[in-house]
């Protein structure tokens, strides 16, 4: 189960590959993307690519399936109608939309696939990797019509492969991490929401993952100083600490149902902050 949740970080969730860091504020909203490069094992190591920033979608889907039956209406949300104005929120929001897509697939909600696909294309274009998503999006829509869930999963895996190359071409480490983190926060909101409704000790093990939490805390601590002055960064940093206190205990006890509900409230508040423009 621990291995499943390590992939449930959604974290890079399809749109992450790392390269030398640049400031979130310094990146333009859209850039032309060259052809998808091949990522060798050596390049992955050099760029810091690992199981948190590029999880297998196939394993991720298995992790969500382990939480079935999914009370979809209780954990679903309205997708953002437009892209956030700032690039950091756009990256976080993109990861969250991917998590929404995984939820729709596991719940087999045909009507939710098209909104997810279109939102993902719009946001990927804003990040400068739209060319790597559009082709897969069309195929996802076609397969959704006939409820070809296995085919949709295959296209999502292809999306991960292509967008990984696109993000690497953009040479933007911070944005890659934020896409990953946005997916993790939305994934945490979904999983804790499910466990709040149908608690089990096995499911509670999904919350107690100090390695994952510490990984993201370390990543945001190294981001550009200007970003660290924002309310968004403070929220990311503080709420990771809050989740860790509830989920990870010295005696290794699992979170109680009350603590899972508290984690859900924290995750929801974080996602609300992501959706709120910086003042």
Regions found by a protein language model. Give the residues of each.
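Secondary-structure edge/capping motif, primarily at the C-terminal ends of alpha-helices
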Residues: 101-108, 127, 131, 166-170, ...
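Extended amphipathic alpha-helical interaction segments
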Residues: 143-226
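A cross-kingdom marker for long, charged
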Residues: 224-279
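Bacterial N-terminal signal peptides that target proteins for export
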Residues: 1-9
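N-terminal Sec/ER secretory leader and immediately downstream segment
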Residues: 27-140
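Short, charged, amphipathic alpha-helical segments
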Residues: 114-118, 138-139, 178-181, 203-208, ...
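Bacterial N-terminal signal peptides
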Residues: 9-17
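Signal peptide processing junction and immediate N-terminal pro/mature segment
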Residues: 19-28
């Amino acid at each position: 189960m621990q291995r499943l949740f390590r992939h449930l970080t959604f974290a890079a969730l399809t749109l992450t590959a790392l390269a030398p860091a640049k400031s979130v504020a310094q990146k333009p909203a859209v850039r032309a993307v060259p052809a998808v490069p091949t990522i060798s094992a050596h390049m992955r190591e050099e760029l810091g690519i690992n199981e948190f920033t590029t999880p297998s979608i196939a394993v991720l889907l298995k992790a969500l399936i382990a939480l079935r039956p999914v009370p979809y209406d209780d954990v679903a949300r309205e997708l953002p109608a437009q892209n956030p104005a700032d690039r950091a929120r756009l990256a976080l929001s993109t990861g969250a939309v991917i998590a929404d897509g995984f939820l729709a697939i596991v719940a087999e909600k045909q009507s939710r696939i098209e909104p997810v696909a279109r939102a993902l294309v719009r946001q990927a274009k804003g990040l400068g990797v739209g060319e790597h998503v559009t082709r897969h999006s069309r195929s996802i829509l076609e397969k959704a019509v006939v409820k070809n869930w296995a085919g949709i999963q295959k296209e999502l895996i292809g999306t991960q492969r292509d967008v990984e190359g696109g993000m690497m071409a953009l040479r933007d480490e911070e944005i890659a991490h934020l896409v990953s983190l946005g997916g993790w926060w939305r994934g945490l909101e979904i999983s804790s929401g499910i466990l709040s409704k149908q608690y089990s000790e096995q499911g509670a093990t999904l919350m107690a993952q100090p390695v994952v939490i510490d990984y993201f805390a370390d990543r945001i601590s190294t981001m550009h100083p200007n970003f660290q002055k924002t309310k968004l960064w403070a929220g990311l940093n503080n709420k990771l600490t809050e989740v860790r206190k509830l989920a990870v205990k010295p005696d290794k006890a699992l979170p109680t149902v009350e603590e899972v509900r508290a984690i859900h409230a924290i995750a929801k508040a974080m996602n609300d902050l992501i959706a709120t423009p910086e003042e």
